[in-house]
Regions:
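N-terminal Rossmann-like FAD-binding beta1-loop-alpha1 element of flavoenzymes
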Residues: 1-18, 175-180
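Conserved small/polar residues in nucleotide/adenosyl-binding loops
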Residues: 188-195
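Rossmann-like NAD(P)H-binding beta-loop-alpha module
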Residues: 158-187
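Glycine-rich Rossmann-fold phosphate-binding loop(s) that bind the pyrophosphate
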Residues: 1, 22, 168-169
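Glycine-rich flavin
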Residues: 8-161, 191
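Glycine-rich nucleotide phosphate-binding loop and flanking beta-alpha elements
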Residues: 3, 26, 134-135, 171-172, ...
Length: 197
């Protein structure tokens, strides 16, 4: 979340600040990474706890989950946090511009021209925080299949019967844990010899 955090600090320090964002505020972490996966994991944890309730002398017959409602809850959490960031930007006087920004050049006095849509902005300083992109491994035949990235996994409306997760990083392991708890037969394929390197 470097972009909006830096914008907030700059504005709090008295700088006139503009934040350009073509997607939802909060970046990958809030919208497609750690926050939504942790929300899904919490639902899985509650479900697992209820399934094992008799072990703790607690009666909980026929535990069940509603997958679309789990996804809806995740979306609600993300939306609430995104709205919170937007409110913080407004409170701190950060102008949020939705859309792409293009650096047009630098004047002789060092001022940087930045265009977004029809508007042009002038700035003394520029911080570029482009976030991250999903890396698609060069696996033969992968491009001919309907594979998921973490983005599609978070948007899924139906629980898959089985799933192969390529990657042993945090997000991959969180998805493996979540889908396994929900009853999906989950396999992980690691490039390295250990998970969570």
């Amino acid at each position: 979340p470097a972009g909006y955090t830096a914008a907030e600090k700059a504005a709090a320090g008295g700088l006139s600040t503009v934040l350009f964002e073509k997607n939802a505020l909060g970046g990958v972490c809030l919208n497609e990474g750690c926050v939504p996966t942790k929300t899904l994991l919490y639902s899985a944890k509650v479900y697992d706890t209820i399934k094992h309730a008799p072990k703790y002398a607690v009666s909980a017959e026929n535990p069940a989950f509603d997958f679309p409602k789990i996804i809806a809850r995740k979306n609600k959490v993300v939306k609430k946090l995104t709205a919170g960031i937007r409110m913080k930007m407004k409170e701190n006087g950060v102008e949020v511009v939705g859309g792409e920004a293009e650096i047009k050049g630098r004047a002789a006095d060092g001022t940087i021209s930045i265009a977004s849509g029809e508007a042009v902005y002038e700035a003394a300083n520029l911080l570029i925080c482009t976030g991250s992109e999903t890396v698609i491994p060069p696996i033969p035949g992968l491009s001919e299949t309907e594979y998921w990235t973490s983005r599609e996994a978070l948007l899924s409306k139906e629980l898959p019967a089985s799933l192969v997760i390529i990657g042993g990083g945090v997000i991959g392991m969180e998805f493996a844990s979540f889908f396994n708890s929900m009853g999906t037969v989950s396999y992980t394929h690691l490039r390295a010899h250990e998970t969570l390197r």
